[in-house]
Amino acid sequence: MPRLQIVVDYILEQIRKRNVDEIETNVYRRGTPSEYNRTRQFQQAWKADKSTISGNTASGKFHYDPDSMEYDADEAQHGSTNPAWGDAREYLAELIYNGASGPKYGDGYWTQRRDAWEGLIRDIDGEDIVKWTRQGFAQAGLTVTKNRG
């Protein structure tokens, strides 16, 4: 694997780990469901794909993968027990992050915004990116030097 790919993969993995923390804080710790058992599949549905190299460009993708979760209508897992609404995996992040919930379960923490994405973007700063880049370079066996000019 080209060394620059190792660096990009390392950075993406750090973003994925930080996202796990943000979902824990902003989604799961905000309340405990009483109508279903939490699977934590939503937290694990965010993927850092392996990077690719094209010419002199390395790129990677961090994304939500709704198909990695299971839908169980009987248990209201990742969707509704109401057949008219059904499987919500495709837009579950939007529902959770915007506090968009139907009237079936009344008011509660699930009707409040629990936006882990906004938290992730706010939490990652330039220092994190620089630190992760340096760590990724070290993991790839590359030396970073500053040329002051």
Predicted regions and their residues:
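Charged, low-complexity interaction tracts
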Residues: 30-149
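N-terminal, Lys/Arg- and Ser/Thr-rich interaction peptides
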Residues: 1-6
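Non-globular disordered terminal and juxtamembrane segments underlying protein topogenesis/assembly
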Residues: 7-27, 60, 129
